[in-house]
């Protein structure tokens, strides 16, 4: 038997119920594509600066009540090197959609999908450390229509070892 757990990426949360469910599964697929590449000073090297698009799709059946979002889709744009002299920084904007599991919370009947609009900028402080201030606007947090929309300001950081 496999432990029932859920996880979201990009600084999201992870939960663990301690329950098991026979035969559960899920999958995700992500696609990234550069749309525009800034010209390189050195013709023999391709510039890493430019605009890219990404798409993420995940699915896990809603046959258990712990899986609150059986379907999730996110799309966005990332520009690397948008600011002059900051060629390793990235500027991001993304839109996410999570479809609420109708069986997830029987006490709350007024639920719907959750939508997230996010924007941020990652500052590459040095070769191994970045800081990323961001803002998110969330419509129907937790898929609950009775909860007011939320705007969240945050700061994430990362290290490469």
Where are these regions (language model features)?
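Short loop/turn motifs that connect adjacent beta-strands in outer-membrane beta-barrel proteins
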Residues: 36-51, 81-90, 125-128
